[in-house]
């Protein structure tokens, strides 16, 4: 969740650290700080607020400082409140470190340190970790780190500098990701490759338990046994321009408009002779045989793509599919075995709960397939098979294009699974693929609905509650629409299967409560219209979204959005844009920061 950057090289470390922290701002944070080497020790500057506040403080307090080695951090408070004292970096004795993660046994460690007369200054688990490393330090940094992490329980990504070993950064991780690169200007390490891309196109992922030593001349990585290890080098396929707004006010709007390209990039490489095909991904048909049950596990938006996948896979493949919240999966003693296919979905590939679910499934012998956007991520590496979504970098906290391509991959899995197991013919599969790629043109058409949805959004900003209704595929999409709205507009919102109205939900419907109803599926159209009539009769303000061929009584709704003509099976791809627009414009109208909603982080790397 937090942002980490470390630099040692030929250039001004303060400048490089601040630049890196600015690149990591999209992850969400409440304070920021840097620490860097000086002739008389380590100097630390940190503050509550944005990186711009830190930049001003550095300019005021350290304009003349010359340094070529340092570490920087953006903090999202987990242990201890938001304050300068609790901000990172933290120092204990000769150790200064930054940390992404949560140390679960920090209280026990704090008690052990207190018995030695050592007390923390802050309220954070991170300072305890620094104190433990310093307590273990007798002049050999790698030995101290190795001994200290043997005492830690939890997730962590540490970057560490020792005051008596200048111009050197040490790093180690467990759970929380770290990526690093060496160039002719020095070495850099970060929690996210977006902080590296201005330096290089090549990087490696630090493995769990491995210790990296960064100097201006090289990076040396040692495994758990202290043996030097040569990491696999990955290539970044996008550039810094892709991670900039490109003329849009917010990244979210830019990323909404990038969906057609992302969908084509995800679908077309998996079309061979018109058929769905994963051979280029190294995913053979053996994955889809001898499977009697599929479990999809994910968090948030990724889980909603799983709901879409469940609907399509069960519809076409006639095999039972469950969708489990990853944070619950491990604790319910799931029923999985060698005939289970576990599909994990994660944009970052580092979502802690999803990674834990994957590891449990592998322990129990399940086949595992991951759907991720980031190459070389932990979930991708640890899965038996991986299907990459080709969304490119997604900077806004609220996911848009990553969701759409996740749904696209779910559809592709359904098509291939059904074809391999004889549930659909090749002719059917070709038809599905053609319609799917044609639907991308309809997604582009939906992008022209911005003014219409903006006008409607302006009527929703004063609402305290907004409800979404749908059935089947529309219900699955309603869940995502509701999440998108609440996370960036701060308006309470819930999505309901429309048939559940009579079972309690309808008691919440009063005069002028907005209800957004999705009615794109002909097989349940009459039912959803009946539900709309129910809320309408109780005074709801109804926004109705339908297909092009739907016949709608004008008195049934306050606003009617008619989608471009689309095959109903693929209508959710088009309707997704409308729901994203509504959430975006409500947030903008309220004057909120669309890209960085409060209390949220882009990548949740702690449980």
Describe each model-derived feature in a short phrase.
Residues 1-245, 249, 261-292, 331, ...:
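Conserved short alpha-helical segments that host acidic/polar catalytic motifs at enzyme active sites
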Residues 4, 36, 160, 171, ...:
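Structural beta-sheet core signal
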Residues 7-10, 99, 119, 135-138, ...:
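Hydrophobic alpha-helical scaffolding
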Residues 68-85, 272-286, 309-345, 492-508:
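Glycine-rich oxoanion-binding loops at beta->alpha junctions
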Residues 226, 541, 556, 566-607:
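Generic C-terminus detector
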Residues 259-263, 267-295, 385-514, 587-607:
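Active-site phosphate/pyrophosphate-binding segments
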Residues 289-438, 518-564, 582:
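Glycine-rich phosphate-binding loops that contact phosphosugars or nucleotide phosphates
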């Amino acid at each position: 969740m937090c942002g980490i950057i470390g630099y040692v090289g030929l250039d001004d470390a303060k400048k490089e650290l601040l630049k890196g922290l600015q690149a990591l701002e999209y992850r969400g944070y409440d304070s920021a700080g840097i620490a860097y080497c000086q002739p008389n020790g380590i100097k630390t500057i940190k503050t509550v607020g944005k990186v711009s506040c830190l930049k001003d403080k550095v300019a005021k307090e350290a304009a003349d400082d010359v340094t070529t080695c340092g570490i920087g951090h953006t903090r999202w408070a987990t242990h201890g409140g938001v304050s300068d004292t609790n901000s990172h970096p933290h120092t204990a004795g000769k150790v200064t470190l930054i940390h992404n993660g949560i140390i679960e046994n920090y209280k026990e460690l704090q008690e052990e340190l207190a018995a030695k007369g050592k007390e923390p200054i802050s309220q954070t688990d991170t300072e305890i970790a620094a104190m433990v490393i310093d307590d273990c330090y007798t002049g050999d940094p790698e030995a101290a780190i190795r001994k200290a992490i043997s005492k830690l329980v939890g997730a962590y990504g540490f970057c560490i500098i020792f005051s008596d070993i200048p111009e050197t950064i040490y790093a180690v991780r467990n759970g929380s990701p770290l990526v690093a690169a060496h160039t002719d200007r020095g070495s850099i390490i970060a929690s996210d490759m977006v902080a590296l891309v201005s330096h290089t196109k090549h990087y490696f992922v630090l493995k769990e338990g491995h210790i990296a030593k960064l100097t201006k001349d090289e990076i040396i990585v040692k495994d758990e046994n202290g043996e030097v290890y040569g990491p696999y080098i990955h290539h970044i396929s996008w550039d810094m321009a892709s991670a900039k707004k490109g003329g849009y006010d917010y990244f979210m709007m830019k990323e909404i408009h990038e969906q057609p390209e992302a969908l084509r990039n995800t679908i077309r490489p998996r079309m061979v002779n018109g058929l769905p095909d994963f051979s280029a991904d190294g995913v053979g048909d053996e994955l889809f045989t001898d499977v009697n049950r599929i479990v999809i596990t994910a968090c948030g938006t990724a889980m909603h793509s799983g709901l879409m996948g469940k609907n399509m896979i069960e519809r076409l493949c006639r095999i039972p599919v469950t969708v489990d919240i990853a944070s619950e999966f491990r604790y319910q003693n799931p029923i999985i075995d060698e005939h289970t296919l576990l599909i994990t979905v994660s944009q970052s590939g580092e979502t802690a709960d999803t990674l834990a679910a994957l590891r449990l499934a592998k322990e129990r012998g399940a086949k595992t397939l991951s759907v991720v956007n980031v190459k070389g991520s932990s979930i991708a590496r640890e899965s038996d098979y991986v299907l990459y979504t080709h969304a490119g970098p997604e900077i806004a906290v609220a996911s848009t294009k990553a969701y759409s391509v996740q749904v696209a991959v779910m559809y592709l899995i359904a098509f291939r699974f059904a074809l391999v197991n004889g549930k659909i013919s090749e002719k059917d599969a070709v038809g599905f693929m053609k319609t799917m790629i044609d639907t991308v043109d309809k997604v582009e058409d939906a992008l022209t609905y911005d003014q219409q949805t903006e006008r409607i959004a302006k009527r929703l900003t004063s609402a305290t509650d907004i409800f979404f209704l749908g059935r089947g595929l529309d219900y699955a999409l309603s869940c995502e629409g509701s999440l998108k709205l609440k996370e960036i507009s701060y308006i309470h919102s819930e999505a309901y299967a429309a048939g559940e109205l009579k079972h309690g939900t309808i008691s919440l419907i009063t005069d002028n409560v907005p209800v957004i109803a999705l009615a794109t599926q002909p097989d349940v159209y009459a039912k959803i219209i009946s539900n709309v009539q129910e809320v309408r009769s109780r005074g709801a303000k109804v926004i109705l979204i339908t297909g092009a061929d739907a016949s709608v009584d004008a008195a049934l709704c306050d606003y009617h959005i008619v989608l471009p003509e689309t095959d109903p099976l693929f209508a959710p791809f088009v309707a997704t844009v409308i729901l994203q627009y509504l959430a975006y414009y409500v947030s903008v109208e309220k004057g909120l920061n669309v890209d960085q909603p409060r209390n949220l982080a882009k990548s949740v790397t702690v449980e």
